[in-house]
Amino acid sequence: MELEKRIYVGGLSSSIESSDLESRFSRFGSVSNLEIINKSTPVGTIQRFAYLNFRTDEDKWQKCKSYLSNATFKGSKLRIEEARPYYLVKLQQEKKIADLQSTNNDEKNEDHSSKVDLEDPVFHGEIIVPGKHSKNMQVVTDSDVRKDPPRKGWKKGPYGRAIVVLRMYNKNTKKTRFFYPLGKNCLQKLWGRVETNMDNTTAFYDSDHDEYVSYGGKRASRDKIRMQAKLGIKASTQKDDNDFELLNNTTGEIEVTKELNEEQLDALRKKDKDTAASVLAELFGSENTEEIDTVSKTSGVLELDNDSTNNFQKEGLDEQDNLQKEESVHIDVPAEFEAFDERTAVVNVDNLKEMFSSNAQDTSKFSLFGNENGVGEESEMESEIDDRNYETMEEEADGETPLAIVKASSGTKGWPKMFTLPNPSSLFQPGNEDYTSREALESWWSENRLFLTRDYKRKRKDAVKRQRRAHEKRIRLV
């Protein structure tokens, strides 16, 4: 069987010519397209090699390699190898193969189109829909999916509508994923819908001022709402008590709440006070309220001032007579609270004395502000105990060893250790010495190695994968 090969001949000297190579290779077959190439190297020398087309059979080719390979010819050692085909010849061959494949594909497409035209009634024009066509090509209605079993490839939606199942194929994983929407917003309900009534809204838009006005009179500009949306600030969820005021308004006019002046506020406070007094009169009777008023008239006054210290002031009676005769003290509200409400509070002084004194005999010495020096009296026993403790602390401080700074030697590096020696000593150890044993370190590492080398990122990825698979499985079951 004849073979046609392209042969590479290397190691040629300057004295070898093309006629010499042709005479040598013609003994084993026919030679054609012999070409000798001179290639200059970076060193400055010239490298010579040759390419030739050689036609022969298998036996002669083996003999040619055994005789001429590594043979010495005119002072040069020949090197014979099978070379790659010439690049122009290779391009021609590839073009021929591509032309043959294109002609074969055209013939197949013509055959396929003729079959589709004859067999597939859904085919229109030159469009070929990939995939399989259903055997039942009738129109699918909502009643078809309500049957048992429903039409193949269709599912029942949330409102009883027919929804097609989408099959998505992943080329990488080579798996098919089924997806069909079952959410409440996937389809719009055609009947039985409840539209929101604009009369039940809690605010309206004022086009003159470009702002929203609630039924309570609160205003919010559109620019402020846009800025909050850009910055990601959530709108306040504070409830307006007058949002539903329009429901009780028969005239249909919107009432806007305004700020009240001081006279109107005083009138409202007086009205609230009268209602509270009437409620107390119904609960406890009118006699109790009169007694409270009489007590407040003849009682002492305790003023609470922020600028100076709190002091008792006598009003009509001395302090000693007032504590013995009167059972209560009248406390006026500070001036900063007078604008809100004028109220009085009744305080029983006897109860205060019982709270802040241990015995009834010490009531005469009782004072909210301490003794004359401004500090409460201290017992003799407590002072003696404090003196003893102070003396013992001084003795311990005298007997304590001084603070010692231990520095590392010149040959070692380490931070100085500062500590108090239990006994005076002249032997100091270097600051960088490790007092932990090797066995203790190895035992600690064996116990905590699993926790310290745990890969949290990998575990999180695995958890996300498991969660996604469970979600896909849940969708298939539905």
UniProtKB/Swiss-Prot annotation:
Domain of life: Eukaryota
CC per GO annotation: nucleolus; nucleus
Phosphoserine, modified sites: 207, 308
One Gene Ontology molecular-function label: RNA binding
Keywords annotated in UniProt: Nucleus, Phosphoprotein, RNA-binding
Compartment(s) where it occurs, according to its Swiss-Prot or TrEMBL record: Nucleus, Nucleolus
GO BP: any one term: ribosome biogenesis
InterPro entries membership: NOP8_RRM, Nucleotide-bd_a/b_plait_sf, RBD_domain_sf, RRM_dom
Residues in coiled coil: none
Classification via SUPFAM superfamilies: RNA-binding domain, RBD
Pfam family, one: RRM_1
Protein name per UniProt: Uncharacterized RNA-binding protein P16F5.06
Organism of this sequence: Schizosaccharomyces pombe (strain 972 / ATCC 24843)
